[in-house]
Each structure stands twice: as structure tokens, then as C-alpha cells.
Amino acid sequence: MDARSELHHYNPYRVFSRSEWANLRQDTPMTLDLAEVSTLRSLHDRLDITEVEEIYLPMSRLLSIHVGAMQQLYYAQRRFLGVVERKMPYIIGVAGSVAVGKSTTARVLQALLARWSPRPKVDLITTDGFLHPNALLERAGLMQKKGFPESYDLPALLAFLSDIKSGRRKVRAPIYSHLTYDIVPNKFAVVDRPDILIVEGVNVLQTGRLPRDGKAVPVVSDFFDFSVYIDADEPVLRDWYIRRFLALRDTAFHDPRSYFHRYAPLSDEEATATAIAIWERTNLANLEDNILPTRPRATLILKKGADHVVDSVALRRL
């Protein structure tokens, strides 16, 4: 067996071309119209009916199979244990770099899954709400590492997911403002026993250090039943980030309340240079050191090309 064949032999993923993946939709119905699809698209991301039909409907079909199998396993284990336990929410993690389109993917999945029959309750939260407040990050000298694992209140995020998975009612999650670039004081989203919870964030597949004393060290992905990593080559991600920064300079940055209001008067050349500096100082380092190494932990990998369209899909073998 040559080196290439050996690598393929031990590859834990089955890789599909776009057309191969699209064929797996079969008769899954399209439940979103053009207007709804438009509202799900993030700034400077690309999403159209064709992308939903060829990429997300097969995902919806696959997830319906996984959720159904998990429900059967739940009832079988309940019979085995001889106890009556509250049914646990199915949790899906969505990971990937800044500017890759995580929010769009998470919202499309939420919209499609909520239209299954019978209509499940599908909630969505982002881990941005579990970032430490800016004041704390500034005191700790971590503002330049915002989005890195150390910038999150990990105990609070783990406690939130533990409460969700145990079936607690009305669990609160902090709310983050992208306008002020900070946690909104005394504002919370309430998650109340959803059937499915989607958790979106750059580092949700992050692993922890192995304990030397044998004690369990929980990580966020311990609570996931399924996970999606959205992938793209670094030069493509860099270009998307610059384009998004320029678009925000012309829109949201003009709001005096914006944390980035100081960038609104910049010329195209100045704004591009600023975006490149931020990308290289923060986002590229986070991608290389923390985000990309977690890609092999995902159940499903969506690989995007320069046009924001998914070119291939990798599904972890069972």
C-alpha cells in the first residue's frame, strides 16, 4: 500500500463532491422560500436557494436520521435502567474561523430543523455571550486575544450546557452586542428545554489539557451530539474578513455607539491596511493555534471555495 492509499485507508471521513452530496437530499422537501433565505444570510456571505437545496437539505435529512436514532437509544437506555428520565435536548455545535459563515449556517439549520414534523423547538445561541466583559479583558491584557480560548468564561459556558443537557427550565445565557463589542449588562437569552439546541462559536470544538491526576476535565464539545466545522483556505478567509470589514466601515461603524466608530472615516486603503493588521495579529493566530486544530473533531466538515459556495463535504465514518 503506497503512502497516499494508506492515508486514505486511515481517513476517518468519507468525502463527497458537491454533486454527490446534493444527491443525498432525495425527497427532502424545501421548506424555505426566497425571502426567508435572504433573511438568514449574514453580511457579505452568499446564500441562495440552490445552496440550501444542494447543501443544507441533505444536512437536514442526515440530522433527522441522527436525532431519530438518538431518541431510540434514549428510550432503550431508559428501559435498561428501569428509570424515567427527562428527555435530553439534542445539541449541535457549529465551529470555524471568523468570517467563514458560521452564523449563516447556524441560522439555516435552525430554520430547516424547526420545520420538521412534528415541529420541534429549535434554539440557537452563540458563545460570544460567554466572552469575558471588555473591562475584565483589558485588566488581564487580553483584548488583543478576544476570541481566543482564554477570553471566554469557560466555567459559565460549561455550566450553561450542563443545565441544558440535564433538562433544566429557563436557563439563561448572556447576550453579546456586536455593535458595542461587549457583553450587554443584565440582558439574557432564556433557553427553555428545546428539543434541539445549536451552539455556534469559533472554539466550540476546543479540547482541554489532559489531567495528570486522572480527574475528568469537561470541554464544551462533550455536550455535543453532532458537530459541524466550516472550512476554507486561509487566503480566502483573509479576503472575506477584509471585505466584511470594508462593508461594516460603510454601515455599522458609522453608528456613534459602535466600538469601531473610529474606523468609519478611513479610506479604502487605510481600512484595508487596518483589517489586514487585525487579521494577522488576532484572527490568523487564533485560527492557526486554536481553531483549525479542532477541525478533525467535527462530525461534518463543509469546505467552501472563494465564492462562499460549499465545494465538498466530509462526513465522519461511524
UniProtKB/Swiss-Prot annotation:
It catalyses: (R)-pantothenate + ATP = (R)-4'-phosphopantothenate + ADP + H(+). GO terms for cellular component: cytoplasm. It is found in: Cytoplasm. Pfam families: PRK. One of its GO terms (biological process) is coenzyme A biosynthetic process. ATP binds at G96, S97, V98, A99, V100, G101, K102, S103. SUPFAM superfamilies: P-loop containing nucleoside triphosphate hydrolases. Gene3D superfamilies: P-loop containing nucleotide triphosphate hydrolases (3.40.50.300). Pathway: Cofactor biosynthesis; coenzyme A biosynthesis; CoA from (R)-pantothenate: step 1/5. Keywords: ATP-binding, Coenzyme A biosynthesis, Cytoplasm, Kinase, Nucleotide-binding, Transferase. GO terms for molecular function: ATP binding; pantothenate kinase activity. The keyword Nucleotide-binding applies. The keyword Cytoplasm applies. Its EC number is 2.7.1.33. Belongs to the prokaryotic pantothenate kinase family. This is Pantothenate kinase. The gene is coaA.
